[in-house]
Design a protein with these regions (language model features):
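Active-site-proximal region of nucleotide-activated glycan assembly enzymes
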Residues: 34, 44, 55, 114-175
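Conserved nucleotide-sugar phosphate-binding/catalytic loop shared by glycosyltransferases and other
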Residues: 2-10, 29-78, 225-227, 312
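Donor-nucleotide binding loops and adjacent catalytic segments primarily
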Residues: 38, 43, 48, 52, ...
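Glycosyltransferases and closely related glycan-assembly transferases
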Residues: 85-98, 105-121, 134-139
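Structural loop-to-beta junction motif characteristic of Rossmann-like glycosyltransferase folds
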Residues: 54, 118-119, 259-260, 277-285, ...
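Acidic donor-binding loop of glycosyltransferase active sites
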Residues: 95-97, 256-271, 278-279
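A short, well-ordered alpha-helix in the C-terminal region of glycosyltransferases
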Residues: 332-346
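C-terminal alpha-helical cap of glycosyltransferases
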Residues: 345-382
């Protein structure tokens, strides 16, 4: 009988791409597995998943933390609606497993799966779990975590340290991707899938200070949509070799070519950076829930695999200093690259895939299989 898996996650690339990595790994194992995603219409998933060939069910959902009073109230209103939508979708889909990989939709979908007694796996990306995953961990069957530091927040019999899931193309050997032209120092600037205004501004300021080195530097810069025109105009007038885009596809190749990565400190970004063995200047998003990005970044800083710059300390001068240190001390850069590579976890997706397969096999053995249980519910879903 064909197995069905529903994955909840999205909003940003940091939550979406681990889900895609898992979906592709499951399909490689068994092409007959049917996979669907649950996300929101406004999230990145609405653009990416159709292109990747996966079904997407959209529900009403929004974050609660870091919102103003009116926005928080609207988020609370959406929560029961999104949960009802999730439950109706699960009853129709009759999945054998639900996987929550973070993002606004994980909570409603996992809660619905628990009510319907569908096996559940959640994946916690950050070193310190958020309140939602701490609570969801109590009702799920299994929990996969990226950092060993976060395992203590969940039951020992449920939790497995897997690392953070990344797409297959990030797991190739170092030599699989050629570096850029010999002698050219390549800086990759990222603000996440939505861009980061403070990083964009600091980088534009740094260009003037780096003028004497512009013959040695190429900059690839993902700006996000809102700052794209402004940033592109500054680069065009700077004389630097550059590639400026609102969003970059084929990110693995960009990482492989990079000499230095300037980026936020989301768990997925750090997993990709370390899998490729790249040195990073980490600028944590200051409004991340529970300050988890700074905590993530400090793991790399402690291993001498990256440099931490807090957002309120960010300036063109700080960026210039970081680039020049990396450019002018190749031995230090090489040592940090090795440290980064050693931190990389290139089999995390396979570990999570195996947990999924174990749960699917276990569900088939049990008489109270999720699909049969759902048949006992008589609901009208419109």
């Amino acid at each position: 009988m064909r197995k069905r898996v529903v994955i909840a996650g999205g909003g940003t690339g940091g939550h979406l791409y681990p889900g895609i990595a898992l979906a592709k790994a499951l399909k490689r194992q068994d092409m007959d597995i049917e996979i669907a995603f649950v996300g929101t219409q406004k999230g990145l998933e609405a653009k990416v998943l159709p292109r990747e060939g996966f079904e997407l069910k959209t529900i009403l959902s929004a974050g609660l933390l870091g919102k103003k009073r009116l926005s928080r109230w609207m988020s609370w209103v959406k929560l029961p609606v999104g949960t009802a939508q999730s439950m109706c979708f699960l009853i129709r889909k009759r999945p054998d497993l639900v996987v929550g990989v973070g993002g606004y939709t994980s909570g409603p979908l996992v809660l619905s799966a628990w009510i319907l007694r569908i096996p559940i796996l959640i994946h916690e990306q950050n070193s310190i779990p958020g309140l939602t995953n701490k609570w969801l961990g109590k009702i799920t069957d299994k929990v996969a975590v990226s950092f060993k530091e976060s395992a203590r927040f969940f039951s020992r019999d449920k939790v497995t340290v897997t690392g953070n899931m990344i797409r297959e193309e990030f797991c190739q050997p170092r030599e699989a991707f050629p570096k850029g032209p010999r002698g050219l120092f390549r800086v990759l600037v990222l603000g996440g899938s939505q861009g980061a205004h403070s990083i964009n501004v600091a980088m534009m300021e740094a260009l003037e200070s780096l003028t004497s080195k512009r013959g040695n530097i190429h900059i690839t810069h993902q700006t996000g949509e809102s700052d794209f025109a402004m940033v592109k105009r500054v680069y065009e007038n700077s004389g630097f070799s550059h590639d400026v885009r609102p969003f970059i596809d084929g990110m693995a190749e960009q990482y492989r070519k990079a000499s230095l990565v300037i980026c936020r400190a989301g768990a997925t970004t750090l997993a990709e950076v370390t899998a490729c063995g790249k040195v990073s200047v980490l600028i944590p998003y200051p409004h991340a829930a529970h300050n988890h990005q700074e905590k993530n970044a400090r793991v790399l800083e402690a291993a001498n695999a990256g440099e931490l710059v807090l957002d309120h300390e960010l300036s063109g001068t700080r960026i210039t200093q970081s680039i020049l240190r990396a450019l002018e001390d190749p031995q230090r850069l090489e040592e940090m690259e090795e440290n980064s590579y050693q931190l990389g976890n290139r089999d995390a997706t396979e570990k999570v895939r195996q947990i999924c397969m174990d749960l699917l096999e276990d569900a088939n053995r049990k008489s109270g299989h999720a699909g049969k249980t759902q048949g006992n519910y008589v609901l009208s879903c419109f």
